[in-house]
Amino acid sequence: MEAEGQKPVRGRVATVEERPAALAFLFGHLPVEDRLGQVKELLEQERRGELSLEGLVVAYDADVSEGGALRGAMLTVLQNDGTAMMFPPVLGDAQDRAAAEMLLQGTTEWFEASEGKLAQCLIEQTDELFSEVLRSQGYSRLAELVFMKRDLEELPELSLSDVEFVTYREETHAEFVRTLGETYIDSRDCPELSSVRSPEDALAGHREAGTFLPEHWCLYRLQGENIGLTLVTEHTDAGLWELVYIGVRPNFRGRGFALLMLVRALHAARLAKMSALTLAVDAANEPAVRLYENLGFEEVVRKDAHLRWKR
């Protein structure tokens, strides 16, 4: 719906010719040189087949047949696990609800026609306008996520124990998938998501969260029985690791294994000469939040996760 005095707006998937300008619009907050570098890198990734820009949607003034003013852009990337990762729209006017609505409508239509299984969008809690737009178009709020970060200068001592671990490779893939599924049982971390997404799909999604580090994906064991696992990814530009998943099987919970696994991940990140380890946790998962806080993780930001299933 257009506000009084606002021009009508139309939205559509960006054509190949429109993509450079739309990407530049998305990075409009950056200095010109950095902006052009980001656009060039994304276009190069698409050319190499590492990224698809088919989910790039634009919104223009509707009363101009050609060359209308660009009012917003929104990018969605379809992952191999079937998750369409939607990045919040960038608007020329932060209060341009009509453009936000058209961008989400165009994105949703693209998603419904794609091979995606679910669409996910993370937005900051201060973004009330787009939160309302998401709800109005059938997206459900999944959880409040707390994003946390810890530097690696001073770490707790890495305790020696009988716990062993194996890393991810083709021969251990099935065991990783099985153990991942077992850690979902009675989990407090986004249980609605784990109940509908298969462990196989989830593992594939974690691989795409950044630079894949199979040698640092660890499955922990005690006397031959699997305890749980930690999965990390590297964000090279930022010089840090992200703990994309940590999970413990039910019969090993409450025995300090999550702490042991987490401390080892911190030490591994420091050995890799990273500056920090980051993670995101469901705010409702109070035991996990306390564990991270006690280990020195500090809250950076909170975001709301919204989902939509394929219809």
What does each model-found stretch correspond to?
Residues 119-123, 243, 277-281:
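Conserved hydrophobic beta-strand within the GNAT/NAT acetyltransferase core sheet
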Residues 95-109, 248, 254-271, 289-294:
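Conserved acetyl-CoA-binding loop-helix of GNAT-fold acetyltransferases
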Residues 1-4, 80, 92-163, 169, ...:
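Acyl-donor-binding surface of acyltransferase catalytic domains
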Residues 40-105, 109-112, 230-240:
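Conserved donor-binding loop and adjoining core beta-sheet/short helix segment
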Residues 105, 125-143, 259, 283-301, ...:
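Conserved active-site alpha-helix within GNAT-family acetyltransferase domains
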